[in-house]
């Protein structure tokens, strides 16, 4: 009793109440599933270790000094007498029965725990598989979309290449058609120069028109095919961009799956053909760059050819206009020479009329005719020897003293009137100068036919001015030389004798035609004077008409010169356009080269990153 009292409550307690796993077993209901699995696993491990230890002791047939227990505690039994039979067999059975029950209990507990863990693991595995399958389906869908985009980009690139080849062939056909047009044009021009019949010219012209029509159709087809090639090239570029976007989506999905499912996700899912796809996309982009570069080269060649042909045509037109300009200038010069010759002929006729009138007026008309003849001969000699016409110098004071002030006064009045009406100052001055010259000429003609007194006044001024200039001219070296030349010419040619003989002949002719009285001679002289006046007016009119014709021809020549300058400007403009096309071609190539360089750098960086990751993985 004393021992029981001394032991207290611990001595009377059940062995299971003091078991080391009691607290752990009582806490099973409050633990988390993971801690629950850890506790049961630890208990199972301890149980199996102890069972293996007991089994090894029994197999070694070692006598048990005391009752072996699983918890290493001695078995308590009631005291008995010394002579009483041992109760080893029954105790052994009870011990065996307790160990078996504990083993059974732990086995059932382990089976329950294992079943629960397996169910949870299965559920997690199902969830994992479903998530993995969803990610795999998403990756498969993106991969299929990427492959479709790559195939479409490749097909579009092939179509663009075929369209570019067709456009090139059409360009060659258009070039051949242009050559045929040039040949037909040359045949037609040669036929026109050779003066072939009209039916032959019509057939050649029809062939030329047909060749032009075929060339136009060929250029239309070439332009259409070039536009189609450009359109397909743009479509290929868009599809290549779409394929690049699909590849980026695949890369993003793979990176997201790797971050979500861990580094082992790549081991559980099949490897995506990303590298081959990237390489294929790079090949497609390279082919696309080749097509774009080829298209730029062809475009530059076509523009260069077009500009060259346009320059050649403009140069041909320029040469033609230049020839026409030279012809118009030559025609104007010939017209001026012709009108000058006509004026000289009429002047000599007027001189002859003056000589004819001398037969009926006596010495005065003859002297006047001789003076006119001397002045005409002297003017021609002076023009031939010195290149200067003294008659022009004699008429210069008339222009400066009479005609020029009159023209300036009329021009000033007309200019002021136009400015008062609101016309621009510069345009008014130009119109006033033109109208002033016209009005002055009209006024002189009207005065010549109507106002005899005014004509006499003007004539007196003209005679005074001419007399003064003639005096100065005779006093100068040119005048003295002219007098000497006239004297020598008179001596050598017998002009004096010719004059006397002419006077005698005129007297005889006057007697032969029956002009004896002075009045009859004056009447004929007046008639001859009227005829000379009419011829002089006709000469002036013909000279004015010739001047107008020459002015028209010169205006045509100036128009041709303007066309020549315009053609030269067009040629310069074509050169500038060709230079701009070359600059645009260089810029396109630079952008494409920069794009491919960036792609190459990105691929190189990706390869370097892969090598670094592989090297680190091997090191681990």
From Swiss-Prot:
Broad class of where this protein is predominantly found: secreted
Entry-linked Gene3D superfamilies: Nucleotidyltransferases domain 2
One cellular-component annotation, GO: membrane
InterPro entries assigned: BipB-like_C, IpaB/BipB/SctE_N, T3SS_SctE/BipB
Annotated region (Disordered), positions in chain: 58-95
Biased composition (Basic and acidic residues): 66-84
Family matches, as Pfam families: SseC, T3SSipB
Keywords: Coiled coil, Host membrane, Membrane, Secreted, Transmembrane, Transmembrane helix, Virulence
Coiled coil regions in record: 309-339
Compartment(s) where it occurs, according to its Swiss-Prot or TrEMBL record: Secreted; Host membrane
Domain of life: Bacteria
Transmembrane segments: 355-375, 401-421, 430-450
Family designation: Belongs to the SctE/SipB/YopB family.
Function: Plays a role in the bacterium-induced formation of multinucleated giant cell (MNGC), which is formed after host cell fusion, as well as in the intercellular spreading of bacteria and in the induction of apoptosis in macrophages. May act in concert with other effector proteins to induce fusion of host cell membranes.
Protein name, entry field: Translocator protein BipB
Native organism: Burkholderia pseudomallei (strain 1106a)
Designated gene of the protein: bipB
């Amino acid at each position: 009793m004393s021992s029981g009292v001394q032991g207290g409550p611990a001595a009377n307690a059940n062995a299971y109440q003091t078991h080391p796993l009691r607290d752990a077993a009582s806490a099973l209901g409050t633990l988390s599933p993971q801690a629950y699995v850890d506790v049961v696993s630890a208990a199972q491990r301890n149980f199996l270790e102890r069972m293996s230890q007991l089994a090894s002791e029994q197999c070694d047939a070692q006598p048990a000094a005391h009752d072996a227990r699983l918890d290493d505690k001695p078995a308590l039994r009631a005291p008995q007498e010394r002579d009483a039979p041992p109760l080893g067999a029954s105790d052994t059975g009870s011990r065996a029965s307790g160990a078996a029950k504990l083993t059974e209990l732990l086995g059932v507990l382990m089976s329950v725990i294992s079943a629960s863990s397996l169910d949870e693991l299965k559920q997690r595995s199902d969830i994992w598989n479903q998530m993995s399958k969803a990610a795999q389906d998403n990756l498969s869908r993106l991969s299929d979309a990427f492959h479709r985009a790559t195939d479409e980009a490749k097909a579009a690139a092939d179509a663009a290449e075929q369209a570019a080849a067709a456009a090139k062939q059409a360009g060659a056909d258009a070039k051949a058609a242009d050559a045929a047009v040039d040949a037909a044009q040359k045949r037609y021009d040669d036929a026109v120069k050779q003066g072939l019949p009209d039916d032959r010219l019509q057939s050649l012209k029809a062939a030329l028109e047909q060749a032009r029509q075929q060339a136009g159709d060929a250029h239309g087809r070439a332009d259409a095919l070039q536009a189609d090639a450009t359109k397909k090239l743009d479509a290929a570029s868009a599809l290549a961009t779409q394929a690049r976007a699909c590849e980026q989506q695949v890369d993003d999905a793979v990176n997201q799956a790797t971050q979500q499912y861990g580094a082992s996700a790549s081991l559980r899912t099949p490897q995506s053909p990303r590298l081959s796809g990237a390489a294929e996309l790079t090949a497609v982009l390279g082919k696309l760059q080749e097509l774009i570069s080829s298209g730029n080269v062809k475009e530059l060649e076509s523009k260069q050819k077009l500009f060259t042909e346009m320059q050649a045509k403009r140069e041909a037109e320029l040469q033609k206009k230049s020839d026409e300009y030279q012809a118009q200038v030559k025609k104007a010069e010939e017209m001026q020479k012709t009108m000058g010759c006509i004026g000289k002929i009429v002047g000599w006729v007027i001189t002859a009329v003056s000589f004819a009138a001398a037969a009926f007026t006596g010495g005065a008309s003859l002297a006047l005719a001789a003076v006119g003849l001397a002045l005409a001969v002297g003017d021609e000699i002076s023009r031939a020897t010195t290149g200067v016409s003294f008659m022009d110098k004699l008429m210069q004071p008339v222009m400066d003293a009479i005609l020029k002030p009159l023209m300036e006064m009329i021009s000033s009045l007309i200019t002021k009137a136009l400015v008062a009406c609101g016309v621009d100052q510069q345009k008014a001055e130009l119109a006033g100068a033109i109208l002033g010259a016209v009005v002055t000429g009209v006024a002189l003609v009207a005065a010549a036919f109507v106002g005899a007194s005014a004509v006499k006044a003007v004539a007196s001024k003209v005679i005074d001015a001419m007399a003064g200039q003639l005096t100065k001219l005779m006093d100068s070296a040119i005048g003295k030389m002219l007098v000497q030349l006239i004297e020598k010419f008179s001596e050598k040619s017998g002009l004096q004798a010719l004059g006397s003989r002419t006077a005698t002949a005129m007297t005889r002719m006057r007697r032969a035609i029956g002009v004896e009285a002075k009045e009859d001679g004056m009447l004929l002289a007046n008639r001859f004077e009227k005829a000379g006046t009419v011829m002089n007016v006709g000469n002036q009119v013909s000279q004015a008409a010739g001047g107008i014709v020459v002015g028209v021809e010169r205006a045509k020549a100036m128009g041709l010169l303007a066309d020549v300058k315009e053609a030269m400007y067009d040629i310069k403009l074509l050169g500038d356009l060709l230079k701009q096309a070359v600059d645009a071609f260089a810029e396109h190539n630079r952008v494409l080269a920069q794009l491919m360089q960036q792609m190459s750098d990105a691929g190189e960086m990706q390869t370097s990153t892969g090598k670094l990751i592989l090297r680190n993985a091997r090191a681990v």
